[in-house]
Amino acid sequence: MEDNEIKLLTRLFQDAEIGMISIDKVIKKIEDSAIRKMFIKQYEAYDKFKERCDVLAVNSEIELKENSAMKKFKQTAMVYLSLWKDKSCRHIIEMMITGTVMGIVDTIKTRTDCGVVSPELSVLVADFQKMQEDFYEKLKKQLAKV
């Protein structure tokens, strides 16, 4: 696996991890069972995606780096700070929409910056972007209901 592909795979893995961290922190604050279930499904989808990244890394004989402790702490602190201001379901959904859009943009930029990659990695990137876009659509629908 080329350096640009390792960078891309690592970034996908780390972005999925950030999504899981964010969901883990907000899910405890959600009282609406339908919205909670939606976030649980998103968490599980991120987890399965991380597993796919792990499999590709093992098959390519590379080790993926997790997010640094500082980045995890920063993400957790940002979520808690935002929740401290407003714990409403509407605010949580708005916050997750913002994070999801940031993830979509990051995926597109990183993919473009990495240039030509293997077909297997291209499929993984496309699947991750599609997954995030699906999350975005579901979050928009929930926002319209609250």
Descriptions of predicted regions:
Residues K37-M70, L139-K145:
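Conserved alpha-helical segments that form or flank metal/cofactor-binding pockets of metalloenzymes
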Residues Q14-I21, K25, E44, K48-E51, ...:
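Generic structural signal for well-ordered, non-membrane alpha-helices
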Residues E51, V55-I104:
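Carboxylate-rich helix-loop segments that flank metal/cofactor sites and access channels
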Residues N4-L12, S33-E51, C89-M95, P119-M131:
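Alpha-helical scaffold segments that form or flank carboxylate-/histidine-based iron centers
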Residues M96-V146:
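Preference for long, well-ordered alpha-helical segments
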Residues D24-E31, D54, E61, L81, ...:
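A structural signal for long alpha-helical coiled-coils and helix-turn connectors
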Residues M1-I30, H91-G115:
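Alpha-helical bundle segments that constitute or directly flank the non-heme di-iron/ferroxidase center
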